[in-house]
Amino acid sequence: MDIHEILKYLPHRYPLLLVDRVLAFEPGKSLTALKNVTINEPFFTGHFPHHPVMPGVLVIEALAQAAALLTLKTSNVEADENSIYYFVGIDNARFKRPVEPGDQLILKATVLKERIGIWKYAARAEVDGRVAAEAELMCTVRPKET
């Protein structure tokens, strides 16, 4: 899945679109995506000026976007103005190594279960085959409140 298809499913745009490409997709089961981390990311200006590190919360956000793509593409639900994909919970988040400019962040999301419209995933971010972060994420699609 290239960036053009990703934009059909995710409502995120610069500077918060954190998935560049989908490398593998197994409907209802798993998705592997890629984020190229460059020194031009706006967050590196302040985090940290002399030793740039991608904020952990943005690594988790990138994982949540990969999980969203897994659910939305599985369900064939494109981004629209009537519904929104919410990140509703996180368990067991761990950060194992920093993510720095020049890294390729591999984002892996695997469905653990789906119940009453809430999806639970095992999510892992890797750089060069080493775990950078991992967590269990919970998300849901809901109508937008007007």
Curated annotation (Swiss-Prot):
Under the heading Pfam families, the entry gives: FabA
Put simply, this protein is called 3-hydroxyacyl-[acyl-carrier-protein] dehydratase FabZ
For this record, an example GO cellular component is:
membrane
Q: What is its EC number?
A: 4.2.1.59
GO molecular function annotations of the record: (3R)-hydroxyacyl-[acyl-carrier-protein] dehydratase activity
Q: Does the keyword Transmembrane helix apply?
A: no
Q: Which InterPro entries match?
A: FabA_FabZ, FabZ, HotDog_dom_sf
Which gene codes for it? Answer: fabZ
Membrane among the record's keywords? no
Query: Under which main EC class is this enzyme filed?
Result: lyase
Q: Share an example GO biological-process annotation for this protein.
A: fatty acid biosynthetic process
Q: Which reaction does it catalyse?
A: a (3R)-hydroxyacyl-[ACP] = a (2E)-enoyl-[ACP] + H2O
SUPFAM superfamilies, per the entry:
Thioesterase/thiol ester dehydrase-isomerase (SSF54637)
User: Which residues does UniProt mark as catalytic?
Assistant: H47
**Keywords, comma-separated and alphabetical:** Cytoplasm, Lipid A biosynthesis, Lipid biosynthesis, Lipid metabolism, Lyase
Q: Where in the cell is the protein located? A: Cytoplasm
Per the record, the similarity remark reads: Belongs to the thioester dehydratase family. FabZ subfamily.
Q: What does this protein do?
A: Involved in unsaturated fatty acids biosynthesis. Catalyzes the dehydration of short chain beta-hydroxyacyl-ACPs and long chain saturated and unsaturated beta-hydroxyacyl-ACPs.
State where it is primarily located.
cytoplasm
Q: Which NCBIfam families does this one have? A: fabZ, PRK00006.1
Record HAMAP family: FabZ
